[in-house]
Amino acid sequence: MAPPWVPAVGFTLLPSLGGFLGAQYTRGEGFRWYASLQKPPWHPPRWILAPIWGTLYSAMGYGSYMIWKELGGFSKEAVVPLGLYAGQLALNWAWPPLFFGTRQMGWALVDLLLTGGMAAATAMAWHQVSPPAACLLYPYLAWLAFAGMLNYRMWQDNQVRRSGRRLSE
């Protein structure tokens, strides 16, 4: 049997795995494309994003461990709170390929809005089980709102129009 700390570490690190894989889209050609975009003055510097995401991913991961532990593992009672969490995490991981990989800022915004909705539903479900676990999602919800505003602004500011028609992003 695994030591009791193994699930806590695993749950805490899991979100960062997808974040690390998604970060691969921000390198090379994806980074050059992103650097060429118009950005609002309130755009965060690139160097701060990894610490922010690392903190948010660790907090949500540990919160998921708290829910898992409180509900006795992957029990029937855990299906909704952990299912919502898994859904929002999958949507979160889909954003970098959409934004940087396909350069579809509009679809990336749709993904962010869905992620925010699922994350809010996750926080509400977690609150029923463990209010402290739900509190670990609040900074993430705030960051998703900020990221959504930034994504929207960049999408709007970088659309090319000819003859009243939008070109593909």
Curated annotation (Swiss-Prot):
The keyword Zinc-finger appears for this protein: no
Main location: mitochondrion
Taxonomy, superkingdom: Eukaryota
Acyltransferase keyword on record: no
Mitochondrial intermembrane side: 1-5, 68-79, 127-134
BP GO annotations: lipid transport
Cellular component, GO, one term: membrane
Residue intervals on the Cytoplasmic side: 27-46, 101-105, 156-169
Keyword list, A-Z: Lipid transport, Membrane, Mitochondrion, Receptor, Transmembrane, Transmembrane helix, Transport
Subcellular location: Mitochondrion membrane; Membrane
Residues annotated as transmembrane: 6-26, 47-67, 80-100, 106-126, 135-155
Membrane topology, record value: Multi-pass membrane protein
InterPro entries the record matches: TspO/MBR-related_sf, TspO_MBR
Assembly, per entry: Interacts with TSPOAP1. Interacts with MOST-1. May interact with STAR.
Task performed by this protein: Promotes the transport of cholesterol across mitochondrial membranes and may play a role in lipid metabolism, but its precise physiological role is controversial. It is apparently not required for steroid hormone biosynthesis. Can bind protoporphyrin IX and may play a role in the transport of porphyrins and heme. Was initially identified as peripheral-type benzodiazepine receptor; can also bind isoquinoline carboxamides.
PANTHER family referenced in this protein's UniProt entry, alphabetically: PERIPHERAL-TYPE BENZODIAZEPINE RECEPTOR, TRANSLOCATOR PROTEIN
Family: Belongs to the TspO/BZRP family.
Name this protein carries in UniProt: Translocator protein
Organism expressing this protein natively: Bos taurus
Lineage per the UniProt record: Eukaryota, Metazoa, Chordata, Craniata, Vertebrata
